[in-house]
Amino acid sequence: MEKEDQEKTGKLTLVLALATFLAAFGSSFQYGYNVAAVNSPSEFMQQFYNDTYYDRNKENIESFTLTLLWSLTVSMFPFGGFIGSLMVGFLVNNLGRKGALLFNNIFSILPAILMGCSKIAKSFEIIIASRLLVGICAGISSNVVPMYLGELAPKNLRGALGVVPQLFITVGILVAQLFGLRSVLASEEGWPILLGLTGVPAGLQLLLLPFFPESPRYLLIQKKNESAAEKALQTLRGWKDVDMEMEEIRKEDEAEKAAGFISVWKLFRMQSLRWQLISTIVLMAGQQLSGVNAIYYYADQIYLSAGVKSNDVQYVTAGTGAVNVFMTMVTVFVVELWGRRNLLLIGFSTCLTACIVLTVALALQNTISWMPYVSIVCVIVYVIGHAVGPSPIPALFITEIFLQSSRPSAYMIGGSVHWLSNFIVGLIFPFIQVGLGPYSFIIFAIICLLTTIYIFMVVPETKGRTFVEINQIFAKKNKVSDVYPEKEEKELNDLPPATREQ
């Protein structure tokens, strides 16, 4: 009977699969799509900025002003992502995980309409403001989707479903690259449609996701609605007997009673969550500061130096995006076999090696004729390495190493680090590139090395373990006797009254 229950636990039901698809396609896909959507049509959009300025002022826009406006267009997205991350805790605690995703569609559908009409309205300000809104959408979804799916999934499918959001981010990037081909929508007339299409997945999610269950953990632990939690589990698992899983959630609820809701400020003060928090910051910072955006930024120049014609670079870039999708799809299937820790070590080590070899290849490309081809290989190897570990695993890891009361605040911190790091790399890499030239990637190699060492020394394997079991592993690292021991309750009570109320 016990064996039968274990087999049941791992079943991917139609309801669970569809809920995963709707959450990831309606939210994570848009993150990836909006990362890449403005790249291909940038020439036509900047011409629109100039034409609009000319119509208003009867003179062409100055080069500096145009560069500033375009920089704002690009940078508003990660800035919005940072704002969205700060909203996560409030939304998921008050609206639930599913409710937060449904609310988040406002920040997709509204800017999609605005961007689609921006050319007719003759307003580049609409585009800049809309980029801020879709950034907020991405900031919320990049945190809430992994949280939602991690709480829906049985523990033996938690890794695979936890990687799905990153898979849909890569699919979104690839679709934007394909739609952004000059023969498709990267044209003077097509770019508003390209930008406006981001609202389609949001509309689908808004229509269909309400018919799928809320997180059972949220319903039981935070809403104290045991019957609703049991019904949600029965719907997700496809059978009536969910007593074992309900008992697991009750144990988690019992373990957390001493803590209550843990705010961001409390999280920074709690000894029992210290190494979980440090690991979150290191992994999220390492994910972005390892140079993934810089690699994509530099890729076009690498392809051109290897002899790829300027008109063909867009196809090679799309090919790189396809490799990213394929490797992330592979990760979905191997994460439960190889484990999270191993994939992180493999991924960061691969990125480290690629950055070192790429530095050598770029330094010697004018001396040795075949070095540009080595550079192309390094870009592809780096993309593969990042797709295997650094891209998909950190968000999944946050879901697994925190319990219900601290998870929203942990995602707020992790998401903020993610988007700030993203913004910093985008802001300073062009200057680093000018100053260091081909040696720019040494900085990213050092970050990959330090992150790899940290993972090897500190990060445990979480595969196949319950949330409480994982926190018991960290309890030893944090030098506390249990997940939430009595002295931790005293620690919380010793905080200043104003802090406890946050």
Swiss-Prot record:
SUPFAM superfamilies given in the database record: MFS general substrate transporter
Single Gene Ontology BP annotation: D-glucose import
Gene responsible for this protein: Slc2a5
Protein's organism: Rattus norvegicus
Identification of the protein by name: Solute carrier family 2, facilitated glucose transporter member 5
Similarity section: Belongs to the major facilitator superfamily. Sugar transporter (TC 2.A.1.1) family. Glucose transporter subfamily.
A GO cellular component entry from the record: plasma membrane
Modified residue annotations for N-acetylmethionine: M1
Tissue specificity as recorded in UniProt: Detected in jejunum. Detected in kidney, skeletal muscle, brain and adipose tissue (at protein level). Detected in small intestine and in kidney, and at much lower levels in brain. Detected in enterocytes in duodenum, jejunum, and ileum.
